Amino acid sequence: MAKSLQDVLDNAGNAVDFLRNQQTGPNVYPGVPAEYSNWRNEQRAWAKTAVLFNQSYHMVELMVEGPDAFAFLNYLGINSFKNFAPGKAKQWVPVTAEGYVIGDVILFYLAENQFNLVGRAPAIEWAEFHAATGKWNVTLTRDERTALRTDGVRRHYRFQLQGPNAMAILTDAMGQTPPDLKFFNMADIQIAGKTVGALRHGMAGQPGYELYGPWADYEAVHSALVAAGKNHGLALVGGRAYSSNTLESGWVPSPFPGYLFGEGSADFRKWAGENSYGAKCSIGGSYVPESLEGYGLTPWDIGYGIIVKFDHDFIGKEALEKMANEPHLEKVTLALDDEDMLRVMSSYFSDSGRAKYFEFPSAVYSMHPYDSVLVDGKHVGVSTWVGYSSNEGKMLTLAMIDPKYAKPGTEVSLLWGEPNGGTSKPTVEPHEQTEIKAVVAPVPYSAVARTGYADSWRTKKA
């Protein structure tokens, strides 16, 4: 008899220890090499010239179609759908009945009664569960990420063209001036004789477009973009640099799925299988709460307070209404101290007392990194995504901390490494924990992102 996600958690006994010792590392980025040139130049290209991210392989897609599609997605998301119409997209965020974030994906409003969700699996699975168990007149079609399929063929290709020269490259690829789109608006364009969907979007703290279309057009469109980029310094980005781009733009890629705890998600855990995301995901870092609830994050904690709208009925509305005026963690960037980083790295050349290894450019070693942020030894928040930015010349981390300590310039410390020498994850070697001094900085860290994303959730506060 097939096991459910709840069976897996029950059999594990201590769910925190179970997920912290899962035999899975961080998310992988298949389909592209680790580096096309080297990750330093690839990072610098998105700030200096332009890059082409290939997102065709690592994300899940879920088509949602039918007469109830709009109402269905509206009921599951904290976002307002007021004035939401075909040709627009949004960062779609579902929460549990208790108000904890499950994940986020990009929601494309393609046509009347037709939507596409693109991103990581947790939010996708949540939508599938409610479609399967509710009375919604919707049809869902899942297109699985490459790592979990054998045919290598996707429904759509998906590229991100980003950087100061992105507009010039797109102009050359199209043979005409691209449409002037507002942030998160879409239009159809022509590249190499193919119809291409274009979403005005931004990653890595730089302006640009997300481009997508039928898989059969992959080579023609990709080749045309590469050719157009030759005179504009276009760099292809491999998996190593790709995983670090969020450090400059301020998006938290890995909120712990709130459906893994709480009575309000019990039916989901009984429905989800033993191979579902929640049964396989890993947690890493120095922060070890007593229960999975300790990993839960609210929309405000990760900077999504601005998109919480109570103008519609949705799962978790009552819980969020109660939370709205309560204190929340505040999302910040932590800039790790240069000298302390040199101290940590020098430990790698010692016979004993080695700190947890910092991989470059992304030092994330689990699917859900959670490290403690301390002030005078007191826990004041958690750090998530961590890594090195060649553009900034700093080791950075995205963190959520007590607002009392969130003012830029405040000195804190990051507790780096896991307790008791580390867990059994394959990405963890024996090591000792150490505190690394850090300074609170704005989020996004990139000055371009703070200016260019002025009208988005990345910079606004609720």
UniProtKB/Swiss-Prot annotation:
It is an enzyme of class 2 (transferase). Keywords: Lignin degradation, Methyltransferase, Transferase. Disruption phenotype: Mutant cannot grow on syringate, but grows on vanillate. Its EC number is 2.1.1.-. It catalyses: syringate + (6S)-5,6,7,8-tetrahydrofolate = 3-O-methylgallate + (6S)-5-methyl-5,6,7,8-tetrahydrofolate. Pfam families: GCV_T. It comes from the Bacteria. Induction: Induced by growth on syringate. Pathway: Secondary metabolite metabolism; lignin degradation. GO terms for molecular function: methyltransferase activity. GO terms for biological process: lignin catabolic process; methylation. Optimum pH is 8.0 (in the presence of 1 mM tetrahydrofolate). Belongs to the GcvT family. NCBIfam families: SyrngDmethDesA (NF047633). Involved in the catabolism of syringate. Catalyzes the conversion of syringate to 3-O-methylgallate (3MGA) in the presence of tetrahydrofolate. Has weak activity with vanillate and 3-O-methylgallate. This is Syringate O-demethylase. It comes from Sphingobium sp. (strain NBRC 103272 / SYK-6). The lineage of its organism: Bacteria, Pseudomonadati, Pseudomonadota, Alphaproteobacteria, Sphingomonadales. The gene is desA.
